[in-house]
């Protein structure tokens, strides 16, 4: 069963952080790539710390071994300097899919006792 094996590695491009540049009076979109570097199919889900300001499309999915997906991370307009942005980040969570499962994302993969890995990408806002 897939859940007894820890999920393998993923890669993200960019690797360490996401940067948005001013002005912030309009919506910005930044693309990141998530690559399944492992030898197993994974399910992934993306979380944000600020759902009012940050969005990700698609927010979840399934990746075969060595497959990649391009995600659009959007930042809605906001009053820079008047809102707390220090803890803004997106988190990629991923887990192995059960053997024989269809290539369709299922939230319950993350709710059982299988291992879930996480990678945080902090968001930096340049004035």
UniProtKB/Swiss-Prot annotation:
Chief location: other
Keyword NADP in record: no
Residues that bear N-acetylalanine: 2
Cellular component per GO, a single term: cytoskeleton
TM segment ranges: none
MSP domain sequence ranges: 9-126
InterPro entries membership: Ig-like_fold, MSP_dom, Nematode_MSP, PapD-like_sf
Tissue: Sperm.
Matches recorded under Gene3D superfamilies: Immunoglobulins
Keywords from the UniProt entry: Acetylation, Cell projection, Cytoplasm, Cytoskeleton
Compartment(s) of residence: Cell projection, Pseudopodium; Cytoplasm, Cytoskeleton
Purpose: Central component in molecular interactions underlying sperm crawling. Forms an extensive filament system that extends from sperm villipoda, along the leading edge of the pseudopod.
Extra facts: Around 30 MSP isoforms may exist in C.elegans.
Name of this protein: Major sperm protein 10/36/56/76
Organism: Caenorhabditis elegans
Gene name of the record: msp-10
């Amino acid at each position: 069963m897939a859940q007894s094996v820890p999920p393998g590695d993923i890669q993200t491009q960019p690797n360490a952080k996401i940067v948005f540049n001013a002005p912030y009076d309009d919506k910005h979109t930044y693309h990141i790539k998530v690559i399944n570097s492992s030898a197993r199919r994974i399910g992934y889900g993306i979380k944000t710390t600020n759902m009012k300001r940050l969005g990700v499309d698609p927010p979840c999915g399934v990746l075969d071994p060595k497959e990649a997906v391009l995600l659009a991370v959007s930042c809605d307009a906001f009053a820079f300097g008047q809102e707390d942005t220090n803890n803004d980040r997106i988190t990629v969570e991923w887990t192995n899919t059960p053997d024989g499962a269809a290539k369709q994302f299922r939230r319950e993969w993350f709710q059982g006792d299988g291992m879930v890995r996480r990678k945080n990408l902090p968001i930096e806002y340049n004035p």
